[in-house]
């Protein structure tokens, strides 16, 4: 059986509301103050594995491309992005994904020298049973293989390689009209790129009574099999529960202290805690990554999306995991880490578009149209070629964005764009989805070149500010400044004198009001209804 508290982890929990995203190290010790989230912004549904001294982590990505960001850490707290598991259209067709479609939760595992990432494209059925598939590689920075589709229903698939070579795929499915955890075994042929199901899918566990059992993970620890899942929905009732048995098939002995993690009904900065995954460090200590939200305001809404967090795990005398101190996730706590801190070089806040390809932070909305984006047409600039789709159309606009990662953020872009006709438009948008966004843009209205701020809230769209421009041939700097309560929009022609022209309340871009499973992006975009639209050129984009 597992030894209780194998790493001697000590906790000093705190619910301080600092905006720190990493930690401070105490002198002469590995005890550090860790501030959750460890990966801020819309990076939900984390899954983790370890290879030697290195940790790798994957998250879901929904309708954004490339999909499934892959992160690397050597201390569990400082993470750098290596790339994406799904960076080709052949791996990730998103034509019919829509808002919060596309890629749901992944599981990332390492087995016999190879990484496996298994997930669901809920908008694409690659097998008779739906959109579950896996990709694999020997290098987590890529490239990853083409999808191997799995004939098993549901979402949130887990892949487990047992000691006898059996490969178990466990997912959240439906049986007899109920959501429950289901499972089958597969034979993988990586050379042929096929996976053959060996048996009918069987019901595995209904959970403990919370709605929507999902996010299953199976572990073999000291000869005991543990099945850990999420329940309660991914909102404030979210929780992690666990059971164990002598086989990956059960029968299951349910933990008497379930849920082992939940902040439900607690006055804590972090909410919706759940969807956990376990990893053991070289010193035999155990850790869990999970998602959480940071709601604000009287209505307790969040705009940053579900974010990746960390907590230590100890094992009690009965062999059950204890997450954190009492199954709660703190925003800030002092923990003894299994490694010395290993920070990565700071990424530049500004992208000058001087490289021959975009960095890992950038995402397209759905699959991009290749001819709509160019880094070589005007060297040192990113050129966007407009499409006729509006931001509210629900289709594929020319759109390129980065996640909002903090409450207080300033995002600025320099735009060179001369609109010719009504409908020609380019600018900077704070984006939740097609129905909820705020943008500042250069366009033409009533025959005059203007700067506008538009608010789209559900089916209501309104230009709330309009400033006539005397010389649209000159580049303009566009800025969005954020706080917990508002997005504020400003412009400048020289970078020194700024004019704020409008604002919008943050809550209308929140997941509770306007979204489903994603967080806010800041994106540059270009629109036009003309047959030969003028190009939109961006010299740089900066997020601080």
Short names for language-model regions:
Residues 1-544:
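Carbohydrate-active catalytic/glycan-binding domains of CAZyme proteins
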